[in-house]
Amino acid sequence: LIFTYLLIKAKEEGTLSMRIRKGLVRGLMLIGIGYVLRIPIFRWLTGNFGTYFMVIDVLQCIGLSLILIVCIYLLARKKTLIFSVVMLCLGTLIFLCEPLFRTYSAERIPLFFANYLTKVNGSVFTILPWFGYMAYGAFIATLFYGYLTRPKFKTGLITGFFVTGLILVYGSTPVFLELAKLINWTLLTEVANFNYLFIRLGNVLVIFGLFYAFEDYLKQPVVLIIGQKTLSIYVIHFILLYGSFTGLGLNQILGKVLTPFEVVFGAICFLVTVSLISIYIIKANTHIYKYIIDKLHYLKSLTKFLNN
């Protein structure tokens, strides 16, 4: 949502090329980080190479989705309305067609690309149907771009989030079943029988509505800092929980023997710890980066002085 909003805004500000470049670089970076987190370094050092590091997780899906959004926007950039409608229709179409690729095995496609389309080889997420959520997010971004300055926009959007979200959660399944009977389309029956995508979208919209409604109370410095460090938090949590590189993480150490109280208490402690680590690591990295840049500038100035 935020990425697409800034992308559309960049056209108005005359910085579209820079924003596109940043988006593509960001997308490729997320894909790269996703693969790196799966590399079993110690196993590789013993000469035991496998293909598990090529499985797809959420970062690769987000990265590829950013690249796809940039490409679609380039095709429809002359009219924001066209881009908005395309993203809404694309998200809906992907969700409706989910039963068609739910069991797709991609047998004739090279493993590297097949993992983006099927979970058969161990992928946690696949680009379909999860790109659908990115498409809906891009559509919502166009609403912010077009109507943010309008009177009562916030009230209207919050109401829309709640109403649409609750309809999707409680009403989408019966609607799909009735439509399937009416037009005799078995695909809608399959969607209704495993309607996790539209229900989850409804939950997301309700949560959006809550966060947007309490926006003024959430603009605390700590909350804003944590919000800016989501990638670092994800990477650190992944390393600690799943044992990236070493293969030994908390899930292997603790297993599934914790009581409900231990799970809740442990989850809170884990979230706080990961957030603090992320904040202080970023601060340390900032100081190191500044120190290196200062030294490089000093060496550059010294070189110029000696040459003169």
Which residue ranges define each predicted feature?
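Alpha-helical transmembrane segments and their immediate juxtamembrane cytosolic regions
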Residues: 1-308
